[in-house]
């Protein structure tokens, strides 16, 4: 009975060590991914105009020539929308 108890304790310790290692690995992966910029922030200026979802204050600043208050739109919406 003592051997079974010791075996169960060793198994519990090994499982908890494995769980801790997996948790650390997941945290490291999350930290790596959180350092990357989201796709909208990866766009850059092309030829003096701001690409999609870039910051803007007027239509002429956007490559699509469509500024929606603070961000460039992918394309202008038809006027009848």
From Swiss-Prot:
The lineage of its organism: Eukaryota, Metazoa, Spiralia, Lophotrochozoa, Mollusca. The keyword Lyase does not apply. It is found in: Secreted. Disulfide bonds join 49-63, 56-67, 62-72. Keywords: Disulfide bond, Ion channel impairing toxin, Knottin, Neurotoxin, Secreted, Signal, Toxin. GO terms for cellular component: extracellular region. InterPro entries: Conotoxin. Expressed by the venom duct. This is Gamma-conotoxin-like TxMEKL-0511. Coiled coil: none annotated. The presence of a 'disulfide through disulfide knot' structurally defines this protein as a knottin. Residues 1-19 form the signal peptide. Gamma-conotoxins may act on voltage-gated non-specific cation pacemaker channels (HCN).
């Amino acid at each position: 009975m003592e051997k079974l108890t010791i075996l169960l304790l060793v198994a519990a310790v090994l499982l908890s060590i494995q769980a801790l290692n997996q948790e650390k690995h997941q945290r490291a992966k999350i930290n790596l991914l959180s350092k990357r910029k989201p796709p909208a922030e990866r766009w850059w200026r092309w030829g003096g105009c701001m690409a999609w979802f870039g910051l803007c204050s007027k239509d002429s600043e956007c490559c699509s020539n469509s500024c929606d208050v603070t961000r460039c739109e992918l394309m202008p919406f038809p006027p009848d929308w």
